[in-house]
Amino acid sequence: MEIFKEEEEEAFSAIEGIIYACEVYDPVPRHLHKSKTKIINAAKLIIETHLSYYTILNNISDIQAYLSTWLRDLGTTGPYQTILSESISLMFDRTVSIFRKCTIEGGFPHLIARLYLRLKSYQKLLNDAGLKNFFSSYDYAFGVAYNLVNCSEYRYDEVHYISNGTYSLVASMKIDPAEVIKREHFRLTIPKFNISNILIEIFHLLDGLAFFKVNPDSLSISTASAETIFRSISEGNHQVLELGRSLMFPLLRTGDFEICRIDDAGAVITFTEAKDVKLEIISLDEVSWVMQWKSCLQNYERRAANDSSFIKTHLQFKKANNFNEDNNGLGLIVDRNIPTDDFTLASTNRQSPPPSNTGCSLHRSKPLHIPLSSVIREDFYDSSLNERISKDGDSSCESFSGAESILSDYDFHDNEFFNNQSPHYFSEHIDNNSREVVITDENTIISLENTQVSRWSNYSWQKISPHQLQVSIIQLRMGNFIVAYDSDYNLHQFKIRLCDDIKCIQSTEQDIQIRVPLGAIMCSVTGILNIRTKDADKLLRVLSFYTTDHTEAVSHSNNQDATASPLSSVSSAMDLKHSLQKCSSTIMPQELTQDVIGSKSDLISNIRQKI
């Protein structure tokens, strides 16, 4: 009985840890607030009940009698079941993964595992039919949620380009699952890199093959219960909750690989640029391999042999040793002799690559969000570079679009970024002109609550406020602004006038990154900001419209005069950085409006309806 009571104390400690984890994990999407609140309330009820009846429970010397009193008489079975049931929503939510990270023992999955195994022991000791039915339903729901996330989440942060003597981290295009012709599981061994018999999934696309590592190294948990998963977590097997697939190499196209050996069980292939690296592929479905995949690989090799004009198309990044006048952005080394027949580079400035940029060809895919430190020097954000951004305008800012897209995988750090600012910092002056920023329903285009805003400073992300902020895009006489403020404390955190010098991009499903160049007028901050919100796609849609130069679109419109927008005229006239005043007409993008908008009120109402 003494051992049992010690185990009970450990279980109560786990419940207290669950309360703490739910309260400190932030930000949590709005659709998870209900589940989180239920877990906290149920956990607190268990703790309070235990404290209230501690004397009675402590005097019970029989385990069966203790459990009967604790679970049945005091009614704690329900709260236990609530915690476990609602934890599925948190652990397997597709928008956030923080609740299934189990790298530390006190992490949320570890705590839930301890509670699950404890309640499971209660059921076995009591042989309770109600608890048995609960675990049967719970295991089924757990398995469905687990497999759904495992089969639908794709990662692109560990893509490696393999060539002679190198295994470098590179950017790669994202794979659209809707474009997959067929997919199949295999076992992969790469002796050179000590990779042995890992589970992968190969996607056959129209233009190549994609090799994805199955992160938990299992097909599904259809044959295993939630108890097996939780016991694995308790034993330190963290890989079991590393769900989804991770792209291993850039897309393999015709000529990128050669077949060394192929038979009815699998194949051995090698990279064209690294013949000493052999990939041993073993099929898990012999029929599918013989009927489909074997001929698929052979066709790729046959096309490569017949195509005498084949050009290698991998995208390779190298760490930039020096950022100078002839070397901007991410240090992408582009071959000057790329044939124009096979590649068309869409660029606004049409400038030739600098003489020093030689060494590889340009990939046809889009860059991937990868850790900043892996491709950029630490002095990437020095003052001289930012000055160059502001001078070169749109062309220079375009060269940094890749940098904006890779600042997604970060931890937030405490900082005092705005602690010394006056509470009325933004309501007093805007560029030496007294302009009050008054936010009303009439001038608000979009408003998002419970957002978290950070700024890139000193090579790390720093939160500008310890509280959740409200971010709004508002329309004022001097232009359109994005503002962040704390409605509870009546404090404004920043104000940025939106114009085409400002670049924005969605780096993750919940993150929008905004680059404000030095010298931007009517902007209280410059540099890179990250706005985390569950409505990131809506915010990006509006930001993209107000940071796009519509002058060229207007000049090619057949009905320019019929599409006048006073909002665009006022906003453009305030942009002192452009010597040519922009047109007073604006063509709204199709995704924002169906018809021509002729007034300020119509503009706001249309945008609100679309978002």
UniProtKB/Swiss-Prot annotation:
It comes from the Eukaryota. This is UPF0508 protein YJL181W. It comes from Saccharomyces cerevisiae (strain ATCC 204508 / S288c). Belongs to the UPF0508 family.
